[in-house]
Amino acid sequence: MKVRVGTTNPVKVRATERAFLRTFPDREITVEAVSVDPGVPPQPVGMEEVHQGAKNRAREAWNRGSYSVGLEAGLIRVGDVYVDLHVAVVRDPKGRETVGTSPGFQLPPDVTEEALSGEEVGEVFSELVGVREIGKRSGAIGVLSNGKVLREDLCELAILMALIGLETSR
């Protein structure tokens, strides 16, 4: 089974492979990373923007006969605060799309403030903790949770939630 993921970020590529292996344990899975333009700002804010980025990534990566995955992280307002979460769009070989999300978590207020002014959460956090390209490693969640939850876990969960939609739409 061929799966194309609309990113070259190794965390998202590994999460895609993990989710598909869990969903299709008897199939051989080949994941191909595809560089695409998500068509949204580098730091999406609001569910509409985050979903649009994931959908654009899935559509740009898709080829008939294969699955594709689009993953986008962003800030979503919940009451008076923002949470960081991932949205996944999975497109099946026939072009049907389903959506899933990861759990969300609250960022420190200063990080949220900088992100809302246009800075990427990953870049702000990289500077804060002195780890280059943290979004391609444990992510902000890895630091905040002391390694209990990693960005790869959040990405995998979002994809698994989207794959449930494909199972129930058959």
Curated annotation (Swiss-Prot):
Per UniProt, where does Mg(2+) bind? 37
Q: Give the cofactor note text.
A: Binds 1 divalent metal cation per subunit; can use either Mg(2+) or Mn(2+).
* Gene Ontology biological-process entries: nucleotide metabolic process; thiamine metabolic process
Q: Which SUPFAM superfamilies is this protein grouped with? A: ITPase-like
Does the keyword field hold Lipoprotein? no
Q: Where does substrate bind?
A: 7-12
EC number assigned by the record: 3.6.1.73
Query: Which Pfam families does this UniProt record tie to the protein?
Result: NTPase_I-T
Q: Does the keyword Plastid apply?
A: no
- Keyword terms, alphabetized: Hydrolase, Magnesium, Manganese, Metal-binding, Nucleotide metabolism, Nucleotide-binding
Q: Which family does it belong to?
A: Belongs to the YjjX NTPase family.
Alphabetical list of PANTHER family matching this protein: NON-CANONICAL PURINE NTP PHOSPHATASE_PRRC1 DOMAIN-CONTAINING PROTEIN (PTHR34699:SF2), PTHR34699
Complex and partners: Homodimer.
Name the chain's protein: Probable inosine/xanthosine triphosphatase
